[in-house]
Amino acid sequence: MAIAGGISSYVLLPNPLVLSHLETELPMFESAEIGHAIDKDTFDAEVPALREALLEVQYELQQQKRFPVIILINGIEGAGKGETVKLLNEWMDPRLIEVRTFDQQTDEELARPPAWRYWRQLPAKGRMGVFFGNWYSQMLQGRVHGQIKDARLDQAIAGAERLEKMLCDEGALIFKFWFHLSKKQMKARLKALADDPLHSWRISPLDWQQSETYDKFVHFGERVLRRTSRDYAPWHVIEGVDSNYRGLTVGKLLLEGMQNALKLPKGKASGMNPAPLIASVDKKSLLDSLDMTLRLDKDDYEEQLITEQARLSGLMRDKRMRKHALVTVFEGNDAAGKGGAIRRVAAALDPRQYHIVPIAAPSEDERAQPYLWRFWQKIPARGMFTVFDRSWYGRVLVERIEGFCTPADWMRAYGEINDFEEQLRDAGVIVVKFWLAIDKQTQLERFQAREDIPFKRFKITEDDWRNRDKWDDYRAAVGDMVDRTSTEVSAWTLVEANDKRWARVKVLRTINQALEEAFAKTDKHDKKKRK
């Protein structure tokens, strides 16, 4: 949702559309160092109406359940961030506001990609989430204290932009607040608190630390704000000296932003109309290159199956696995044998090492979140293995075919999925993706067999027959999916599955090869570090 919520008289940044094209740093904090203040009489006169309006818009947000509100809190220590959020909780219904603080990463978080900790805390549609210590705090602290260099900061900035763009495209309304104090104001505030026996406890080590690194923090903060203020998620710089001004400004920005978003027509599609995808002119698909006659006889199958299962068992116990997690994605035609292949993989492992996640239609809670949210919840820790039976690719397959999302939604999903998988790769997750392919005649034979065999009858449903009628549509969607998401980061493996034995062995062998290649890269990297 492209909502630049805010009131022009309170937005202290240049137009974000103009700002995003500037190449030189701007003194964008100057307007937050001029002594903004609201007298007590004015504050007391305005608060009742503002509070009533905020409650009204908050309950309308809850009733409509069309989008979540995400509030990112950043800025100078001592500039009133916590006090302002406390005030908002007093003015609004705190039961509908989830305040989250991201301090030092826990062991659970360190074992997963960096974005995992944020995805699992996203507010559902109809609710508000306040994030302290968010992705901007992490990148700024890292750069100020020399834990990362400029190149890594630029990567983090680009990652934040992609994350926010996706959340907004999924409907989220994002407010980004930078609470500011000049260096002189910050030191004066800290001294006043330190001299007050009743309030000195409010000063944290981080406050004193930031007073020493103020110039660097503001320098890199300006760079981050300049690079990430966009029309869909602009920054609002708030002078933090006067609590009355601070509270009214934030309250009015939230009010007008939410009012504007709620006025948009229901079901309004996000984004522009995408360029159309056309079928291959010569009707050829990558699936046509598969040799569907490949098969294994029973003796060869049993020998190779045992060999590959033993190989997988050993690789999963390898000490180098402690630096990695493994994710396998199983997609394919109905009746292509995904379940049988997954069982042969699981048979090689200790049940404590893996988790199988069957994916069906999203639940009510899952529909209240961005579509990738439910998959982020299941990303394994290092040393562990998660099998997805169906996956995030439903966005560009069944949701595309059945019209469950707009063309703009599934078209942008290719890039979002590539970014998601790159984040996994960068965190040490090995992603192996399978499309199990069978021809139309083989599918018909398996459907008929399922109807004829009582203990297999549960496997066949009306949806299977209905999907079969859309064979050509799915074939085109699979071709587009492979073309756009088979990358160096995470390639698709197309599995000839007319013969189930061949398919099962190929799946196991591919997983083993992926693990061995990842371990070899780990060895090379460790050897280079030792030098």
At which residue positions do the language-model features occur?
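Glycine-rich phosphate-binding loop of ATP-dependent small-molecule kinases
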Residues: 2-531
